[in-house]
Each structure stands twice: as C-alpha cells, then as structure tokens.
Amino acid sequence: MRTPSTHPLLTLAAALAVAFSSVNALAQRTATAPGSFAMVAHHAVNGVAEIVAATPNGLTLVYTSADAGTLGLVDITTPARPQTLPRVDVRVGGVGEPTSVAITPDGRFAVVAVRMDDDLHHARRGFVRVFDITNPRQVKPVKDITVGIGPDALALHGSGKTLRAVVAIEDEESDAKGDATLGGQRPGRIDVVGLQSLYGGTDSGLQSIELVQALKALPGAVYPEDPQPEFVSIDHQNHMAVVSLQENNAVALIDLRHPRKAQLLKVLSTGTVVRRGNADLQKDKEIALTDSFTGRREADAVAWVAPGVFATANEGDGKKDKAGVMPGGRGFTLFNTRGNVVFETGAATEQNAVRHGHYPDGRSAAKGVEIEGVAAGSFGGVPHLLVSSERGSFVEVYRVSNPAKPELVQLLPTGLSPEGLATVTRRADGQQLFITANEVEGSLNLYRFHPQGAPANPQEPQLVAHEGIAWGALSGLTTDGTHLYAVPDNAFGQSRIYRINAAEHAQGRMVIDQVTLLTEANGQPLKVDPEGIAHVADGFWVASEGTTVDGNELIKVNTAGVVQQRVKLPAAIQARFANPKTSTGFEGVAASADGHTLYVAIQRGFDLAKPQAAIVKWHIPSNTWTTALYPLAQHSQDAKQFWMGLSEITLLPDGRLLLLERDKGGGEGKAINAEVKRIYSVNAADVTEGAVLTKTLVKDLRRDFNYLQEKAEGMAVLNGDLWVVNDNDGAGWTRLLNTGKP
C-alpha cells in the first residue's frame, strides 16, 4: 500500500494477509468466556485529564489536571451520568503540577504527587500532598511531605498504620522545549514515604532508594548514571513494587515486606522487540505493515497482572541509537520477576489498530501506536489487562487467565490521547467499570463490564475493516440505498472510496468490505483532499477541498474509480471570495436523483469575517451555477477560536437539503468546548441566486447524543435513517451514529 496498486479495487489481502495472521490467531482465542465491555459515558472536563483513580466504593473519580494545577473530582454514582464536582487546587504557593494520584484503601484520602516547576537549571524538590476526600464536595488538605526533584507516578502499599507511598522521582531535567535531558547530571531515584500517621501510627519517614550502581551493573542499561523512574505498580499479594525506568530501558523491583523499610531487590532490563516485515516505519500517508525494526521497549506504565507477572507498556522515549535500534516496542510485554518474557504482543496490537481505523500513520517513523498505559483488574472473576494507545486513542482488553496466552476480548475507542487508566471492581451495586482519562481533549470515558457480553448497539455500531484494508479520516458519506460509501480526506496519499456493508448493524457492527483507489484517466494515482461524496447512477461525484479557492474541485469518477471529469468554480464565483489564496473549502456534495444537479457546501462561505457559509448549485446540463448564503451560529465562548462551518450536505427525496453545521470545539479544541454539532434543513428550491437561506433544526448531536467529537463530517440517509460519522484525523474514535429519521 506504500506504492498502491493502480487496480481500482484494492483489498490488500495479498500484501498484508501474512501480517494480519497473528491478529486472526489471537482473535481465535477470545471465545472462552463471554464477558466484554461497553462504553457508558464520555464525560467532558474542564482542562486536561491525565492520571485517574477511583475510590474503593467506585462512586468517585479523582483525576489530575497538570495545566491548571488541580485535582478534578467526578461523582459516578450513576456511571452513565457523571457529575462534575468542585476542583481542588494542589499547588503550593501557586506553583506546581499534579503528576499522579492514588486513593487510600478506605477511600478517606487522596495522595498526590506534585512537581514544583523543576527543570534543567532549577532543582526544586517536589511534594506528596494528602487531601481528605471523605466528602468529595468539600475536600480538605491534610499534610505535605517533601520528596525528591520531579516526582512522577506514585502508588500506595499497606493500609492504616502500615500505609506508605512509593514515588517515582524522575528528575528529568526538562529543557526549554519541555523535553527530558538524557544522560543528565541529576539522577532520579525511588522515594518511599511513610503515611502511617494518617491513621495514628508513627511515620517511617522518607526513604530514598538509589539506582545508579544497580544500573551500571546491568548489561544493556541506557544512561545508567541518570535513572529516570516513571511509573509504579504494586503486587499487594507479594508486597513488591515494580517501577519502570523508561529512559534506562529497565524496571526496578522493590521489596516492601518490611513495614518500615523498603529494599531494592533487583533491576531488570526490558530488552528489545524485534519486528520482521510487520511494522510501518514511514510517515507517508499510506499504512503498510511491511517494514522491520528492533526497538528498545522503554516501558512507560507497568501493571501486575498476576502474582509475579507484570505488564509493560512499551511506549519508548529515547532516540534511535548508532546501531539503528529504535525507541519503543509498539506493543506490550508480560514479564516475570526473573526478567523472562512470558508473552510479547509483537505486531498484533498495531494490526488490530489498523483494522479498527486507529493506526496513526503520522507516528510511523517515530513510535507507531505508542502504547503508554496498562492496568489490570478482575472482572467477572477473571483477570483482565487493559492496554491503551496514546496516539491511536484506543484500549485493548485482554483476558489473562493464563499469562502466557492472553486472550484478546475487544478494542474500544477512547477520547483523544488516553493518559490514565483506572478500574472499579467492588461497587455495592455489582457494576464493574474501567475508566480512561484522555489528556488532549480533556475527557473521561467510562466502560461497564457485562459478564454475558456487552449488548449490541445498533445505534452506534463499531466500524471494522476486512483484513488488509487500512482506513480512517472519513470526511464524507453517501449511499446507493444498499451500502454506505465514505471518502477519507488527505490523511491518505492516494484518494479512495470505502464501501461500508451495513448488513450486521443490528449486531452492533458495520464492515468496510471494499476500497476503490481513485486514478486519473492515464492510470496515475489521484491525490486530492476529498471532503464530500455523492453517489450517482454511473459512479460518484467527489468534492475536493483546495488550499486556495481555485483548488476546490468537483471530480466525477466511474464505478472503477477512474476520473471522468474535473470541474472548478466559475471565475465569477471565485471572484466573490474575499481572499482567493485562502480557501474556505468544499466540504460536501449532494446530487439530485437524476444526477443532473449538484449542491456543494462551502464550509465558511466567501468571507471569513462574516458568519455565513454558502451553498452552490450546479445544474449540469445547462452549466448554470447558483449561489445562496447560509447563516452560521456563533460559539458562545470564543467565536474566533471555535469558528463555525458546514461540513456536509445531503439532499432528501422530499426536497430538503440537510446541512451539518459544527464548531471547532472537541478533540484538540477540548471536549468541553464542543458546543454546536447540529443538523439543519433548508429547502433546495430556495437555493436561488443571492438568497439568504432560512434553516430549521433537525438534529442536535451535542444535546441529544453527547457528540463531543470535533469533526462531525459525514452524513447520509440509509433505509430511512440519518447516519453521521466523524473524521478521526487518521487515527482515533470513529463514531458512526444512527440519529434516526431526518
């Protein structure tokens, strides 16, 4: 697929069948138990959401928001309806960022690691701050303990008068860009902090565990004189902590059996992953898992999945070395405490991401799906492992009854860039949950475990592809009455059309079963920016957005994907744009039943300074062009930053044109700012020259469907129901939604 075949129907089966065989083999091991998860809430928060923890009763979530220096609290008494509670400022003298939070076993206290603006030139020690959260609506500070420079993750061991915190003191010596200094002058360490006095005991004080000598003695350790502890997980049964030393490509095991004195047991190398012919190392707008590499695992998160067995999230954080060894393993690994690999995911996680539209080609040359998080919990009495991808915005769920043979249960979409994971397994009402904290968009996702299998959701079926089809960035939608068809935008190099088979939508699933590559008449690949598509009897019209006004095009292709005609706006209409060098964009196209008339949505009209989009009508037989103006709503908070535009147009048999109007809120614009995601109708007959159209609300996606995705971009009516899909920018949650009758 890197140099796509010019044959019009591209299944890629021949190119990728071998690469996907391990996914199929893994999938065949999933039928031993029926339990699975379903998303019950996607909750926007104010600011970012990074590390998340849950109270033991499973009724309250606490998450860190570093940019604001706060803890956020959310009431999840009813998981499907989270309620935001007042935030808590954790800064000291107005300075500091929370990097981690853990909840005591009785749920009384939140223990927070706070980094104090240390950097390459300022060695400021951090704090462990304790807050009383007995009443989550009235959180009270309790005590502060000074720890080392740059605390990162922490975890708790013991309870009551034996309670201690194990803190990863990273001291990454950040430079002006915020990047860690590798091989720095200030070695990190592991601090063990006594918290016994919270329950009337005598604190064991601060014990610092140095790592330099152990790393120097470890073959293959990277930057051994600069330990950088990252993440902590505790095996409560064996009283042992595993701490990832990410940049050092190692983990440390800490013995916590003595109630007042911790001991370094050993440091283990996390070694390398070797991928042969099943990775994508090129950022080229094509997804082809055909390359090879060797990568240092460089684990970020770690989690105990069974006594004596822990998982590593092989994110990678360094650079390619002189031998060509890359940072990151692009998957996860299970190790035992001897340092032996119990299980290695290899290519399976990335192959799974490709099939579900979550593979981030823009990260191919770096770290691929960038697995950052792992968490473990017992659901339905069975051990499970959760594996999250920061760049792909998904979680894989595995059963680990046998750590040597994890069983893939499912892949679930998350909000943009999941950073933290938490499990809830002991609620009084029996509900078991897991939660993701999604940093970039500022949201929490809640998923509920169903012991007999999650019920099908035909309103929001999961979209998957046949083996060998890479997909994403769906920017336009149409139908032939039997199938849906979608185009991706220029996230892919060669333009293409996907066919979506809706036969299984009642079972909560739709399948991309065919992809047609678009070519010029001479056989050369067509490389444009498709933003809309309309089905006609002898093929499709594609609306391509140009980088300038003159670059906007309507492109006719036949059923084989070969270009038949390319049409630009007439010069008289182009002259109406306030700035011809700035395209406000073709964003959708609709065709009349006879194919004689096209309607085109121009995202932001002719003048960016005016809150108006435009509709252009082209009567093909007479070559007559007509323009009308469409009034846009305005964002209530910041109309400039969260500008409004049209992203799709659909013509109904009753003569109404449906327009999908949206703001820039959601995604990188933060979920809490997703305000306008609406479908309006206008009468097609009213599209006359110079008219200002009157719009009528048909669907409010934000209000009625909690639609927090930024780019709601595709819309089509199939079997009487109006379907909407978002552009995931190439990787992430593709939300295909049946909104009902238009």
Protein language model regions, located:
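Gram-negative bacterial Sec-dependent N-terminal signal peptides
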Residues: R2-L26
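Sequence/structural signature of beta-propeller domains
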Residues: Q28-P742
